[in-house]
Design a protein with these regions (language model features):
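Glycine-rich, anion-gripping cofactor-binding loops and their flanking helix/strand elements
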Residues: 60, 204-295, 375-406, 418-422
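Phosphate/pyrophosphate-binding active-site segments
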Residues: 2, 133, 153-156, 167-168, ...
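A cross-family phosphate/adenosyl-ligand binding-site feature
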Residues: 1-54, 160-187, 217-234, 239-263, ...
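Structural signature of the thiamine diphosphate
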Residues: 17-18, 60-97, 120-169, 188-198, ...
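Thiamine diphosphate
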Residues: 28-102, 200, 215, 220, ...
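Short glycine-rich anion-binding loops that position phosphate/pyrophosphate groups of nucleotides
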Residues: 25-26, 71-75, 99-100, 158-160, ...
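Active-site diphosphate/adenylate-binding microenvironment
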Residues: 4-8, 12-17, 22-26, 30-35, ...
């Protein structure tokens, strides 16, 4: 086997199933490897930003990495905005980038650039492969790093891809054990039972079904309010799921909301800050007079951490459906008249099917949607944790490939759509739902 085949076989043995790619000359051995090594299906994208956005959507819905295959530094540059979103959302991505042959780099050919430095801006882990002897181990290490909820970048020179391997052992990723800090759970239980007004701010995996179920039980026990980050990578919403109040985008409204609380417990989200530096407003949305407690757990352990908090509080094992916010589906009436942004939000909330995946990049047009959809049938919503627009249509591609049995609805702002229109070609080519 050559290096490309070793890489693909290692990834397939680790459970990876898809690769989103816009390859070039330096990636041809890997392209050929998809034909000779079974297990990973390649999906062609016409633009690298669509490939990286699709990998983000796929990873958010499966909790395992898709592979991206990008062409040299400029290909990485074209895809970097949606890798930024993936990084901010804690999405697992195996980001493979082709590089010039090792002996050709000194020629300073037109496409030569400092890939490693650029990759470092979005990668939680990265490595440049220098020999086929370590390529399987390098790939396994990258996958293990990605599974921790980050972009793991592997830079592979073309001669490492095409060279035959003297060592054909296939290595497995070594997955690190999950961690939950018990002291932080005990501290959270203490402050939640104070007689002061308290909020539990949820983010990341705390917004999955298990996390929200535990948060609902904590709310019933302690009387705290449930808040959520503004643009979560993934959140479960709808009837029967504990509802959260979204921290507003604009600083004045966000400060008004958060200043109501003397005690703040944070689970799975960094302390909230303003999106930009707004004149006359602080960057921090919390203040020094508030008592702030952070639940310390790795990304995947947050639901378990909240369940541990339930046990520490001796919260109820079950709560009534009415305690989640809505016990019955309530749909708005279909509006009449012109199709406005507000009416589009109403129509979507009125018609979206049960178990839909809503990829929400509606930006300013979708302000009415969130409060309307909280009483819709249970659904998953994905938003824009990194703020880099142009994610919606590619993310919908990845979500549809990840969950072909579920309808995917992309609520898309027209301006943001212009960045990654090529995703429509991918949706049509693959016949996605």
């Amino acid at each position: 086997m050559n290096g490309a085949e070793i890489l693909i076989k290692t990834a397939a043995k680790a459970g990876l199933e898809v690769c989103f790619t816009n390859p070039g000359t330096t990636e041809m051995p890997l392209v050929c490897g998809f034909d000779s090594i079974p297990g990973i299906k390649p999906y062609l994208g016409l633009f690298e930003g669509c490939c990286t956005g699709a990998a983000d959507g796929y990873g958010r819905m499966t909790d395992k990495p898709a592979m991206t295959l990008l062409h040299l530094g400029p290909g990485l540059g074209n895809g970097i905005a949606n890798l930024h979103n993936a990084r901010r959302g804690g999405t697992p991505v195996l980001n493979v980038i082709g590089e010039h042959a090792t002996w050709h780099l000194q020629a300073n050919a037109p496409l030569t650039m400092d890939i490693a430095t650029l990759a470092g801006t979005v990668s939680g882990w990265q490595r440049t492969c220098s020999t086929t002897d370590t390529l399987s181990q390098d790939t396994a290490d990258a996958i293990a790093a990605a599974l921790a909820g980050q972009v793991a970048t592997l830079i592979v020179p073309s001669d490492v891809q095409w060279s035959e391997c003297s060592n054909t052992e296939i290595h497995r990723p070594k997955i690190s054990s999950t961690t939950i800090d018990k002291d932080s759970i005990d501290h959270a239980a203490e402050v939640l039972q104070s007689d002061q007004k308290t909020a539990l701010i949820l983010g990341g995996w705390a917004l999955r079904k298990r996390g929200l179920a535990a948060a609902g039980r904590i709310k019933v026990k302690t009387g705290c309010d449930l808040l959520s980050e503004r643009a979560p990578a993934r959140i479960e919403r709808g009837v029967g799921i504990s509802a959260t109040e979204v921290i507003p985008y604009f600083p004045r409204q966000a400060l008004e909301l958060l200043s109501r609380y003397q005690v703040i417990v944070i689970a799975g989200k960094a302390e909230p800050v303003t999106f930009f530096g707004w004149q006359g407003y602080p960057s921090r949305l919390l203040n020094d007079t508030q008592r702030i407690c952070r639940i310390s757990a790795d990304v995947r352990s947050l639901p378990q951490a909240l369940e541990n908090l339930v046990d520490t509080l001796d919260a109820p094992g079950r709560i009534d459906a009415s305690d989640t916010g809505f016990s019955e589906i309530e749909r708005p009436d279909i509006p009449k008249g012109k199709l406005t942004a507000n009416n589009a939000s109403i129509i979507l909330a009125a018609l979206q099917p049960e178990h839909a995946i809503i990829v929400n990049e509606s930006i300013t047009s979708g302000g009415a949607y969130l409060p309307l959809a909280v009483s819709a049938p249970a659904h998953t919503m994905m938003a824009l944790p990194g703020g880099a627009i142009g994610y919606g249509m590619p993310c919908a591609v990845g979500a549809a490939i990840a969950c072909p049995q579920r309808p995917v609805i992309n609520f898309q702002a027209d301006g943001s759509a212009m960045y990654t229109l090529q995703a429509l070609w991918m949706q049509a080519r693959e016949g996605l739902n």
